[in-house]
Amino acid sequence: MGTEVQIREATHGDLDRVVELYDAICDYLDATFNYPGWTRGEYPARWTAEQALANGELYVCADGKALLGTCILNGVQPEGYRDIPWQEGISPAEVLVVHTLAVHPSHLREGVSGHLLRFAEQYAQGHGKRSIRLDVYERNVPGVRLYVCLQQKCDGKTC
């Protein structure tokens, strides 16, 4: 990817493009191998983006021409996180969770996920977060591999 990318908080003007990206990646996963178990129109879907947008948690990665990827950043930890032996001494308020990291199929293997995760690290530092937790399904082999390659520590069955 030779073009400069920008990551920013999404606006209402981005909503349709985010939903199109969700639909495109779900179609791609259905045609290949659906590691994350996403279903078009169910998750991720318009409601996912609308809720995150309303909460100021939806972020987009764009290159000036196209929406390349998106993610949701917040402190909401899924139910299963309670059973994982996380690093001691970190309160829930000091945790940032990356949810619904999605890259448009036309831009896979261009480093978009890496850009989004580096942005999440900067965001966490700027907002007093001491830990980043990556919400990824344990059988999502490419997702887990990505996080390991980017030197994220995996605890238990989630990263």
Model-predicted segments: where are they?
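Conserved GNAT-fold acetyl-CoA-binding loop/helix
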Residues: 26-48
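A short beta-loop-alpha structural element at the N-terminal edge
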Residues: 6-20
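Conserved GNAT acetyl-CoA-binding A-motif
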Residues: 117, 124-135
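Conserved acetyl-CoA-binding loop-helix of GNAT-fold acetyltransferases
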Residues: 103, 109-122, 145-149
